[in-house]
């Protein structure tokens, strides 16, 4: 079994669609092994998204991710990373396939409802950034 990391972003939490996103996650065969609702500080968002620190959108991304609560998740299933990327859809909701979370719920390239690890290395950094081993089932 493989694990991946997901965030239900502020835009989705603000619109009260967390339950709908969780339904899609479970329907895709994921087991939720860790979940909590948190309020990121700007500094925590900057630490999490450090790989984008030189990109022009970094400041806006960190402000967005710290503007209101998010739900962080550790997910498990076979081929979890690739499957979660498939279920999320393209980063830009306008380019996402029908039936994906971002196509159904995303508002823009920034307010695109969810984040997901893009590699085993990312998941290995992202899961312990938010969860201790004791919090994972």
Curated annotation (Swiss-Prot):
Cellular component terms per the entry's GO annotation: cytoplasm
Taxonomic superkingdom: Bacteria
Localization in the cell: Cytoplasm
EC number: 2.7.4.6
Main location: cytoplasm
Cofactor: Mg(2+)
Catalytic reactions on record: a 2'-deoxyribonucleoside 5'-diphosphate + ATP = a 2'-deoxyribonucleoside 5'-triphosphate + ADP; a ribonucleoside 5'-diphosphate + ATP = a ribonucleoside 5'-triphosphate + ADP
Annotated Pfam families: NDK
GO MF, one annotated term: ATP binding
BP GO annotations: CTP biosynthetic process; GTP biosynthetic process; UTP biosynthetic process
Family statement drawn from the similarity comment of this UniProt entry: Belongs to the NDK family.
Function of the protein: Major role in the synthesis of nucleoside triphosphates other than ATP. The ATP gamma phosphate is transferred to the NDP beta phosphate via a ping-pong mechanism, using a phosphorylated active-site intermediate.
HAMAP family: NDP_kinase (MF_00451)
Listed name of the protein: Nucleoside diphosphate kinase
